[in-house]
């Protein structure tokens, strides 16, 4: 069984990279060619590397490991929240707080404050306070929910971090590498693949592409925890290859790099 089909990757636009003026030369081996000033990612390599990332996350989950989903760019926020909640992962989808990993004990105190305020709200304790104090506490609560709402159950640093756009989430990547926490990430043509342990070459700007890849990482985590396969039944023949990308888009020849 395949983790993802070539058709799914194509339909989600995973193969579209950035403009040729904006690229990282380290990504050259994952690029098939260029068309109309846009790099085209080699989906054969994407498929293979996604499978490696899937197996890694699945095996970590089977060992009882935890995973943190990170994606704060607008296109990723809702997907990160939905898929993390679906598979029972932790998540950050608005703002990465400095020291979230490297100074986790301090961050944990803020998470505890969030839980305390939520309990006060649920118990009606806010209603017994002066309106000015209610307003102040609700502002604090809203801010904590936004930044830490996906971390309430995280009592230690995670075993794996999944990231959408390592350039955007460079602070998360830095902290993870500092603590030697394995990273899995969608890596577009403008990113540095050397910073990531398990790269998934792909479009990190299109919502459909982010949704597809993130859902597969969530499936891997669920499969590891539950022991039930979430992989796709084969739907297409092996001979489908990267060249077919261009037949689908138009008949112009691509520019090899």
From Swiss-Prot:
Keyword annotations: Ribonucleoprotein, Ribosomal protein
NCBIfam families for the chain: rpsB_bact
Protein's organism: Thermosipho melanesiensis (strain DSM 12029 / CIP 104789 / BI429)
Family per similarity comment: Belongs to the universal ribosomal protein uS2 family.
Keyword Ribonucleoprotein (UniProt): yes
Record gene name: rpsB
Protein name: Small ribosomal subunit protein uS2
One BP term from GO: translation
Chain segments carrying region Disordered: 227-257
Molecular-function GO terms, alphabetical: structural constituent of ribosome
Sequence ranges of Acidic residues compositional bias: 241-257
InterPro entries: Ribosomal_uS2 (IPR001865), Ribosomal_uS2_bac/mit/plastid (IPR005706), Ribosomal_uS2_CS (IPR018130), Ribosomal_uS2_flav_dom_sf (IPR023591)
Record bears the keyword Nucleotide-binding: no
GO cellular component entries: cytosolic small ribosomal subunit
